[in-house]
A protein has these predicted regions:
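Short hydrophobic/Thr-rich beta-strand motif most characteristic of the beta2 strand and flanking loop
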Residues: 45-52, 60
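Conserved phosphotransfer cores of two-component systems
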Residues: 62-64, 86-93, 111
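Non-catalytic signal-transmission and effector/linker regions of two-component phosphorelay proteins
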Residues: 1-23, 125-141
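Acidic catalytic/metal-coordinating carboxylates
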Residues: 52-56, 79-83
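Active-site residues of response regulator receiver
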Residues: 72
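Receiver (REC) domain active-site loop signature in two-component systems and cognate sites
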Residues: 75
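Conserved acidic segment of CheY-like receiver
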Residues: 21-32, 37-41, 69
Length: 141
């Protein structure tokens, strides 16, 4: 495994294994949570880009081909809804999953996020299954 820094400042770990075609952007300012999520997704065969802030996530989203985004709601520089709104302006077709200690918020019904998952209660297999469903329902590039 090698760690590669992208021009946007985000990083990607390259595993020596067959990869699914989807690239997932994970945005979380908690390093441990970000690493655990990256490991889960990489183990499932996804290419994973990690960003340690909302602003870095937006920069990465603009500069890399992204198939889905998983982001934390509560971050220091911007909250998950602010980030999701900016991402939707750039490309509204990319599925967005928000992880939140607050559970589902009203904004989900307004189309900001495709899915809300309560942090601490998330089942890794549930996250992978829902991600796969969202990717399958996504319009082709």
């Amino acid at each position: 495994m090698t760690l590669t820094k992208l021009p946007s400042g985000a990083f990607v770990r390259v595993l020596e294994m067959e990869s699914k075609t989807a690239t997932i952007l994970c945005i979380d300012d908690e390093q441990t949570a970000l690493q655990l999520r990256q490991h889960l997704l990489e183990s499932a065969g996804y290419r994973v880009l990690g960003a340690k802030s909302g602003s870095l996530g937006i920069k990465t989203f603009k500069s890399e081909p992204i198939d889905a985004v998983i982001l934390d709601y509560w971050m220091a520089d911007m909250n998950g809804l602010q980030v999701a709104r900016e991402l939707r302006k750039i490309n509204s077709a990319v599925p967005i999953i928000i992880l939140s200690a607050y559970g589902e918020l009203l904004d989900e019904s307004l189309g900001i996020a495709d899915l809300w998952i309560r942090k601490g209660e998330e089942d890794p297999q549930y996250l992978l299954n829902r991600l796969e469903q969202l990717l399958k329902s996504k319009p082709a590039h």
